[in-house]
Amino acid sequence: MTAEALSSGELKAIRPYPARTGPKGNLVYKLITTTDHKMIGIMYCVACFIFFFVGGLLALLMRTELAAPGLQFLSNEQFNQLFTMHGTIMLLFYATPIVFGFANLVLPLQIGAPDVAFPRLNAFSFWLFLFGAAIGMAGFITPGGAADFGWTAYTPLTDAIHSPGVGGDLWIMGLIVAGLGTILGAVNMITTVVCLRAPGMTMFRMPIFTWNILVTSILVLIAFPLLTAALFGLAADRHLGAHIYDAANGGVLLWQHLFWFFGHPEVYIIALPFFGIVSEIFPVFSRKPIFGYTTLVYATLSIAALSVAVWAHHMFATGAVLLPFFSFMTYLIAVPTGIKFFNWVGTMWKGQLTFETPMLFSVGFAVTFLLGGLTGVLLASPPLDFHVTDSYFVVAHFHYVLFGTIVFSTFAGIYFWFPKMTGRLLDEQLGKLHFWLTFIGFHTTFLVQHWLGDMGMPRRYADYLPTDGFQGLNVVSTIGSFILGASMFPFVWNVFKSWRYGEVVTVDDPWGYGNSLEWATSCPPPRHNFTELPRIRSERPAFELHYPHMVERLRDEAYVGRRHAEELVEVSLH
């Protein structure tokens, strides 16, 4: 472009980052050697979405098989491998690591840190997860196929007699390696939050997302080492004849206790960070501060504490656990979750709501998770649980809870923070199409499964009889699953197109009302995140930076309750 053209005011193509330099293969070298938390966060997200698509493909194969009675194109053995690997991929190779994807992308920015506490350990955690997941999935290319004993790996199904193939061993080792990556990631996040907060960033000025990652990381340190130990025991059983999980010694129940003491905190490990994501999004699109900040923090801590006291509700049907205690504790965990809902609704109440794509996905999360939570309260009652245990009612319940939380909030977070990651905005029209396809597809797939479960359709069966009367609802469910699968196409195209050609973000805060510190630096941020930090005087430093004329009023309104309490104390003293 000539100097004349520039002086005449002609538009010049700009990029949100410097032009690419370096020889061919430079990007690959950079990815392999990087210790930049933002780059690692993007790598986590991309890797997790690849696993998400693979897990979704396995689910589509299962739903196609179940659309009609009789075995269509899968054998019983193949079906067993599919549901085992589908559960494992979705929970341990997608949901858990994408927590650390978001934590890497956002947490150091939110606390004003230049990077995480241990950047090399951070990179090591990612590569452990990636190679662990690859090892776990490698069973598909072995002669005996992948693991086929269910993602819960109940003994004696997992012993050397019932699962002799190498697929089971690869599954065990893959989970051990990927789990180590998760443990190290949690150590890193705890240290980062405790040691690297910017001046003025007290614990109760941290964003809710940062709080939730901190609590989640503590839960990881409680739960994942136990899983690792249990898996090593299982490997010893299979190869050394250790007899740890022998049925004769009560080993079957031992495995269930060990697994679910990991498994239930794991459910909250993959829920709390996503509660944090929507807690960041609701205030921005409601044009209001988060309602009940401190109660949200205490609710998060309560959920974490209770989550390690309810594991045996997965074992009601064994008849070997104290039903009243675990039933009551499970009911109890609904209380802090209800407080969170109250706060989210309170944040939106009388706000100036706008429904951009992140807000749509957040509302979709709230609706779906609420329904899943209500069926969870039903399942907490042992008499009801005995009726529907191991049926499609349970499948519908945990998909409502997990898909509602993880997938809807993941998409909300990606649409929300994509401009911060890349310096470009995602396409709103494609985003709305993506949301409605996801929402309609999901509810069509899983709502009818509650009724299938109540009618008595067991989970994990590859086939059913024409006389069972399950076909009609199964066809509806399968149609919904293909709508859900189709929803990924606008998303992938949107990310690809926007990353390369999307609208360039030229401001720190493209949404206009961001609260936390990540909206006080450029899009994308410089290598060490900030060229200068604003003063941190509340939990909304970026908002106060962009709206300085509002600070006095915000202070005045924020402390009305506290001031009123002080006045009451003074009156009572006089």
UniProtKB/Swiss-Prot annotation:
InterPro entries: Cyt_c_oxase-like_su1_dom, Cyt_c_oxase-like_su1_sf, Cyt_C_Oxase_1, Cyt_c_Oxase_su1_BS, Cyt_c_oxidase_su1_bac. Its cofactor is Cu(2+); heme. Fe(II)-heme a binds at H86, H399. One of its GO terms (molecular function) is metal ion binding. PROSITE patterns: COX1, COX1_CUB. SUPFAM superfamilies: Cytochrome c oxidase subunit I-like. It is a multi-pass membrane protein. The chain crosses the membrane at residues 40-60, 89-109, 121-141, 170-190, 213-233, 258-278, 290-310, 315-335, 359-379, 398-418, 433-453, 476-496. It is found in: Cell membrane. Its EC number is 7.1.1.9. Heme a3 binds at H397. Cu cation binds at H264, Y268, H313, H314. Keywords: Cell membrane, Copper, Electron transport, Heme, Iron, Membrane, Metal-binding, Respiratory chain, Translocase, Transmembrane, Transmembrane helix, Transport. It catalyses: 4 Fe(II)-[cytochrome c] + O2 + 8 H(+)(in) = 4 Fe(III)-[cytochrome c] + 2 H2O + 4 H(+)(out). GO terms for biological process: electron transport coupled proton transport; oxidative phosphorylation; respiratory electron transport chain. It comes from the Bacteria. One of its GO terms (cellular component) is plasma membrane. Binds 1 copper B ion per subunit. There is a cross-link at H264-Y268 (1'-histidyl-3'-tyrosine (His-Tyr)). Belongs to the heme-copper respiratory oxidase family. Cytochrome c oxidase is the component of the respiratory chain that catalyzes the reduction of oxygen to water. Subunits 1-3 form the functional core of the enzyme complex. CO I is the catalytic subunit of the enzyme. Electrons originating in cytochrome c are transferred via the copper A center of subunit 2 and heme A of subunit 1 to the bimetallic center formed by heme A3 and copper B. Associates with subunits II, III and IV to form cytochrome c oxidase. This is Probable cytochrome c oxidase subunit 1. The lineage of its organism: Bacteria, Bacillati, Actinomycetota, Actinomycetes, Mycobacteriales. The gene is ctaD.
